[in-house]
Amino acid sequence: MGRIVIAAFKPKPDRQAQLRDVVAKHWGILRAEGLVTDSPRMVMRAGDGTLIEVFEWCSAEAIERAHRNAAVQALWAEFEAVCDYVPLAVLGEAQHPFAEFDAMGL
């Protein structure tokens, strides 16, 4: 059974453009490695510049496989260089029942 995830990436100072580039290729690599479903992903931007990505892993096992996959690990290292992973609760938008974000065309 698929697993929906919502990931929030807060850019490090002066790393907004690099973060956008890494997020742009994230889903494609996961898909090429057979780890995510064909369901379209969504990418949004919060008011503070945090990027939010929503996508569906194929299974809990696929998530585990990602942690042993060289291509995914290399990409995640790129993420760590340009952002911090943050919980949704820190976003101002998450304090409202109907959180709204800017759509990103990635």
What are these regions (language model features)?
Residues 1-73, 80-106:
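Short S/T/G/P-rich N-terminal loop/turn motif that feeds into the first structured element of a domain
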